[in-house]
């Protein structure tokens, strides 16, 4: 938020739980230009306007409105899956594209984001391996997709991209799906913070695991156990 405020104009409205009044702030280029008490609901609303207005060179690298909107939508989807306890609402050109209920049910978030057909073809995953726990959902072998865009991984509630985790999931489906088809999944891996380094990529979407073999095995066997139970195999 600090980085965004340094290159935009921001109107912020916030009130803490139990506070009598809220506060309205107006910032430009990271500087607070006005601050005043106001009556408002609990929570925080942030309006960002004129992004990169003071850095025209950066503005030249902005993609089309459609591309930038798609990128923002993707981030909102990731956060909605990582935090089903928070309600997310995304509007584009005044039209609601996504609304999650914030009731803490990850399946409800999956339903809101990916739709009924995918949600109805997912199996729950919950397995432990050493100090790791793997939770979430994977699709049945009969409900695969044509690419990996439907795979979402979270480590300690942080969205990441990981070939290792994709490989672990796909290995569990070996001989169960056709070549060129991929399982969809939403998986959360909980692990000790010292077991993962999140500072290997500027966007922090790539991580380095202290023990890749252990992480691979934890995810692989958790998913394999789910598929075996669903198929009636011991």
Go through each PLM region and give its residues.
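N-terminal phosphate-binding caps/lids of nucleotide- and nucleic-acid-binding domains
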Residues: 1-234
């Amino acid at each position: 938020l600090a980085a965004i405020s340094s290159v935009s104009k921001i109107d912020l409205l916030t009130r803490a739980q139990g506070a009598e009044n809220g506060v309205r702030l107006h910032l430009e280029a990271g500087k607070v230009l006005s601050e005043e008490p106001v009556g408002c609901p609990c929570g925080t609303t942030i309006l960002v306007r004129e992004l990169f207005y003071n850095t025209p060179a950066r503005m030249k690298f902005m993609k089309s409105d459609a591309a930038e909107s798609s990128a923002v939508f993707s981030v909102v989807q990731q956060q909605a899956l990582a935090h089903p306890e928070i309600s997310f609402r995304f509007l584009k050109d005044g039209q609601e594209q996504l609304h999650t209920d914030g009731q803490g049910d990850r399946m409800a978030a999956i339903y809101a984001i990916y739709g009924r057909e995918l949600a109805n073809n997912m199996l729950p995953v919950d397995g432990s391996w050493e100090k790791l726990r793997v939770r979430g959902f994977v699709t049945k072998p009969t409900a695969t997709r044509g690419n990996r865009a439907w795979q979402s991984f979270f480590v300690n509630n942080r969205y990441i991209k990981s070939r290792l985790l994709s490989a672990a999931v796909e290995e569990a489906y070996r001989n169960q799906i056709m070549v060129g088809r991929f399982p969809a999944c939403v998986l959360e891996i909980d692990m000790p913070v010292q077991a993962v380094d999140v500072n290997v990529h500027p966007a922090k979407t790539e991580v380095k695991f202290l023990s890749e073999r252990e992480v691979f095995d934890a995810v692989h066997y958790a998913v394999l156990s789910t598929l075996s139970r669903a198929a009636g195999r011991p």
